[in-house]
Every structure is written in structure tokens, then in C-alpha cells.
Amino acid sequence: MHFDFSVKFLMSLMLAPVSVYGSLPDSVSSHTNIPEVVVTGENHAPVPTTNTSQTLSLKKSDRLVLQNVSDAVRRMAGAEIKDYGGIGGLKTVSVRGLGSKHTLVCYDGMPVTDCQNGQVDLGRFSLDQLDEIRLYIGENCDIDAGALHFVSPSTLNLMSSAPIYSDKNYNAVAKITGGSFGFVNPYVSFDHKLGDHNSIKASANFSRADGNYPYTLTNGMLKTEEIREHSESVCGHGELSGRFLLSPKTHLRAKTHYYVSDRELPGGVVYYNTVNNETLKDKNAFAEVVSRTDWDSTMLMIAGKFNWSACYYHDEAMMYPGGKLDNRYFQREWYGTAVVRHNFTDHFSMANATDYILNSFNSNIHGCVFPQRHTLLDALSGKFKNEKVTATATLLGSFFFNQVEIGEAPDNYQHLSPSIAVSYKPFAPSIYFRASYKNIFRMPNFNELYFNSFGVRTLEPEKTKQYNVGATYLYESDKSLESSRLKSFAISADYYFNKVDDKIVAMPKMFIWSIVNMGYVEIKGIDFVTNLEVATSKRTSLFLTAKYAYQYAVDLTDPKSDIYEHQLPYIPKHSGNGSVAFENPVVNVSYNVNAVGKRYYLPQNIRPNMMEAYAEHGVSLYKTFDFKKFDMKLRGDVVNLTDKQYEVVRFYPMPKRSYKASVEFKF
């Protein structure tokens, strides 16, 4: 199917758009959950408030033909995924053209970080362990959060499910998925109620694939059929968590997590040379505790986390002494946060969050300086809310202290970062207008500062300014009116303008690369999301979702440069996706299309650097059977239905048509 047709299909979905409910409460009490916009999922979708926020419910994710976490994030307005291909390829998220290092990834509200390269691989998380995904852009309207949540232009929060008990004191899930290219993925979880208010949960996930999929290698007029080799991926995780009521006012959450992956790296496709011997093994373990106490008008949250990561890189080639290279990288992070919030009136509250972070890094590579970074963050926030207006404002103080064991450490850094957001509900309970501004920055990561061949210790932070205006309309039919066919409808649009100063880029100098501050970038764009739920009969329903994004992201560093006003690499001007799901008593059917316009993989926008537009289609059939003692769900997927070959990252071809099937039991 051609890309132009896919864009027209997306636009038709947008003109006929997800489920919504409820107006906002008038108080800012400690038990108020400020709603956001839900892309799709269950039959509810709270609205955007002061910032641009979206929630993707995964309880009904079959409607979207989702394959993994990165595929789910791709459906959210403003989010782009960089995928290095293959079953186990690195998958990172960038929001509104700012780059993946500007996106904070959290798991159950606690940060997931990487001080070495500043980006998190979404492939380490499984959809099976998640309940919903939230994306916040700009000012964080949740002033109960730790200070680190205010540091990034956007925050991606992956939320696991809280246990729900009805007539029994346990829940159990067993699921196995199999598919093309040797893919096997079993998952199990078990949670148990302890007394009236406490529970524990254990889960484990394992996946394996050989990843040897076919692709077409094109060199001018010559085309050959090849097999992507050296692509085996094996990974798994185990997790133990608990929720406890320590007193009538105090709740405690605790979690331990271990993840390991062992991947062959196929590398980029090079003409007539498909041999690659690189492997990468990752290990990660963390333990965290979160305590929250709610009094009548005051909330206190204290949380701590220890995170350990190890990365083992191996390569074999004649260029290395002894014919092989073994590099090892280790990270440790200690994180602590304390948040206090007080409601002065029913409409006004203030909060203060203080975070401390200690990052350390070591490696066996020559020239490692064994760096450490102490970070102190303090965020003072205020929120006002009445029937028509919601406003939040934050002043973030950031203090960074750098240390190295060898040589001279980079300068310490401190900065004050303001942000503000306002939403207005003028006359109808379902119409909201919003505007926001955020001034923030990104510290250089350890690779950019210290890496042996190109790190530069004099780098300045990358500074960003975000401006956003938007509007949302929501409709939900009266539950008592069963005759109403239109059950829910939501439409949301945002215009944004981002400025980036002192952009950190890699530049070639003679025979080596160097990291420098040399860029000024402007990004202007539009995000559009719409959803629709229609009851086509008493027993059948139709669900439609659509997203469209326009981005004009250009380099304005030097008017004399060959790349002045050229679109930034890997950022398409046009992209979007849409889905249609038909649920009925026989078998449920869902269809999805993800379309991406042309883009360039190098800064200069010339024909040799252009990557063609593509559209990927998927179809899913799913059915749940309710038995007396358990539920069983069967699902089958066809991914890349039209057998389209495309690349998300240049020289890393994605798989063509593939198949998946799964069976899930819930007890």
C-alpha cells in the first residue's frame, strides 16, 4: 500500500475519531488524581490538564495490535522511536524532536537512568508486566513527584498493574508467545493478598529469537536477497514487589528487579560484507522503596533506590591485539527523594521536592578516569485549581558536582529552571484550553565528557525552551442511555515551539570524532490525537484511534553552512498512525497502520541522504474464553502485513512480514 493512501486513511480516521469520562474535581486534596488524555484502552479517558499528557491503557491493548513497549510508545502523539532493527535491537524514544537523551523514563514513578550514554533501551521492558504508559510533555502537573521528574522536557512513565482481589486472595497469569524467526516468549506472574491491606507479587519473563530474517539488499540497479545473520537475542527479567499499609495513613511500596540480556549485534548492512562478530551482554539490578503518608492537608513521600548496571562488549577482528576486544562498563547509582505537599485551601497547594543522586562509572578500557557525579535537585511547586482554571508553576534548582580519579574534572554546574502551565475550561465541562512554558537543560553524559577518543570535559549543558498551546474536547454518553450509539469521543491538538541552544553534536576532525557545543535548533510542530468508540449493536463495538504529527526541525547554527535550515536527521515532517478494532461475540479483529514520511539520516538534506517514506500495517485476531476457574485468551498477529521492507535507522533493515501467536491463562 502506498504511503499517500496511508496518510489519507489516517486523515479519514481523524475526521471520525477514544473513550473518555468525567470532569475534574474542584479540589486539590491529597486524594485527587488529575486526569490526562487516554489514547485508547478501557472505556475511560481522562482529559489533558495543564500540560500535554497522554495515557495509554494496556488492559485493552489488543485493539492496537501492539508488539512491544516501543510499539506502544510510538502510538503517542509527539513520540518517535529510533529502532536499530532486529528482534533485540536497541529501541529509544525521542519526544518532539529533542532526542532520546531529553526523555526521562520512569518505572512505577521511579527514574530509570543511564549515566554513561543518557538513553534507556525500551526493549528491556515487557508489555506483559505493564498496566499503562503515561507520557508527560513540558511542565509536570503532578507536584507530588520527585524533583528529577521536573528535569527533562518530557517524562515517559511505565506503570505496572496494582493487584485487585474480589472473591479470592491471589491472582496468577501464565502466557506464552511464539512467532517468526525463532521467537519464544513465556511470561508468568503471581500475586497474593496478605491480610486486608498488604500484598506481594512475583513475575518473570524470558524471550529468545534467532532473528535471522530475510531482507533485500539494493545496490544501484542490483538487488539480492539476503538473510540477516548474527542476530540472536536472549533476555529475561525477574521481579519481586510488595505493597504494605504501615498505618491508616502510611503506604509503602518495595521492589527488586533483575534483568539480563545476551545479544549478537548484526551491525549495519554493508555491501558484500555481512560478517559481524560483535556481541553485547547487559545486566541490571535495582532495589527501591517508596513510603507515602497522607494527613488531612499534608502529604509526605520518601523514596530511595539503588541501581547497578553492567555492560560487556565483545568483538573479534584482526585489528585488535590478539584478535579480540573485550570492554566492560559498570555503573552504580544511589537515588533518594523527599517530597512534602501542603494544601493551604481547597484550591491552592504547594510542594517541595529534594533529590540527591550519586552516579559512578568504571571500565577496563584504557584511559578510563573513573568519574563520579553528585547531583542535588530542589523543586518548589505551586498549584491552583478551581472549576475553570488549573495552573501549576515550578522553580527547579539544579546543582552538579563532578569528580574524577585521573586528570582534571569538568567544572561544577548550577542552574535555576522555571516552568509554568495553565489550563482553562471556559463554558463546557468537556472543553479545555492549555498553554505552557518550560526552561530546562540536559547535562552531558559520561560518554560525551570522558570517552577515550572523543569525550570533551569542557562541554556546556544543552539548553531547551519549550512553548506549547493546545485544546481538548471530550464527550461521553450517559451510561443510562443504552440507545446511544456514540459512547465516547475525544480530540486533542497542540502546537509547540522548541528552542535548543548549545546543542551537543559529534563532529569529524581529521581522522577522529569530537563532541562539541555548536548548535542552535528550532523545532515547530503540531500534534493531533483523536479517538472514537461506537456501539454498533448491543453486542458489538467499534473503536477507532488516530494520531498525526507535523515537525519542522531545522538547524539554524550558521547561515553560511550547507545544512542551514535543513531538517534534522531522522525527523520526518509528517508521521502518524491509526487503528480500527471491531469487538464482537465471535472473534475480535483489529487493524493498525503506522506511517512515516521521508527523512534524512545525515544533516544535509540531499537525495543520497534521504530515506524513503513507509507504512507498516498489522492485523490481529483475539478472543477471550471465560471458564469457571480461569480465563483464556487466544491471539494471532500478522506484523508488516504488506511485506514492506523499510528502515527506521539507516542500514538497519526491519523485518518483513512476520507472524505471532499467543495463549494466556488468568486464574
Predicted regions and their residues:
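Extracytoplasmic beta-strand/coil segments of soluble accessory domains associated
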Residues: 70-111
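N-terminal periplasmic "start-of-domain" segments of outer-membrane beta-barrel proteins
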Residues: 35-64, 92
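Membrane-embedded beta-barrel scaffold of Gram-negative outer-membrane proteins
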Residues: 301-315, 433-436, 462-524, 531
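A beta-strand signature from Gram-negative outer-membrane beta-barrel systems
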Residues: 127-173
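Structural signature of Gram-negative outer-membrane beta-barrels, strongest in the C-terminal barrel
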Residues: 247, 345-498
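Flexible loop and strand-edge segments within Gram-negative outer membrane beta-barrel domains
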Residues: 209-215, 224-238, 243-302, 306-332, ...
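Gram-negative outer-membrane beta-barrel transporters
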Residues: 346, 388, 486-490, 494-499, ...
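C-terminal beta-signal and adjacent terminal beta-strands/loops
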Residues: 544, 595-602, 621-667
